[in-house]
């Protein structure tokens, strides 16, 4: 089913790859999907779609045993054929070690600057919400801009200054 569903998603969506959350546990699935000719990006550490089962959005790989599991998972997804791996919500030192020990690129989100590349959620980076995760940086404050825009819209609507002449259709004299 995984290969069939991945193929359908890949063919019908126009995406460039399939991203699978999980490490050693999903390596056989990654291998099968890659064998079918579909590129796979793996995602280990804090995996958002299963965060509830991990006790919420918490840093992963803090104990020696958990760190070793993540390193083993990175190696397993690489061996299974993943072309890259997202490292999310793990200590910087662990992300550095994983990046050095595997031969596929790492993409970090809350994993320190040592990964091969970085990614952030647009809403966090653009400040679209009041709260942002510890690892994210607000590069803009769109939350304030959005709230101000809604308040201005409500004000002008209530005052009946919007819509105005420039933003409404003109009546034809023959119709009125």
PLM region descriptions:
Residues 1-133, 137-140, 144-172:
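Alpha/beta enzyme core
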């Amino acid at each position: 089913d995984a290969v069939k569903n991945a193929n359908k998603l890949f063919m019908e969506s126009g995406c460039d790859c399939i991203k699978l959350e999980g490490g050693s546990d999903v390596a056989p699935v990654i291998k099968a999907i890659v064998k079918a000719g579909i590129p796979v990006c793996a995602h280990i550490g804090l995996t958002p779609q299963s965060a509830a089962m991990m006790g919420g959005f918490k840093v992963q790989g803090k104990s020696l045993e958990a760190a070793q599991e993540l390193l083993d998972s990175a190696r397993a997804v690489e061996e299974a054929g993943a072309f890259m791996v997202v490292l999310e919500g793990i200590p910087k030192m662990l992300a550095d070690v994983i990046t050095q020990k595997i031969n596929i690129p790492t993409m970090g989100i809350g994993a320190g600057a040592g990964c091969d590349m970085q990614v952030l959620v647009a809403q966090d980076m653009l400040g679209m919400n009041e709260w942002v995760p510890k690892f994210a940086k607000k590069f803009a404050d769109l939350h304030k801009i959005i709230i101000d825009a809604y308040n201005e819209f409500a004000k002008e609507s209530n005052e009946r200054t919007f819509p105005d002449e420039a933003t409404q259709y003109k009546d034809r004299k023959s119709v009125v």
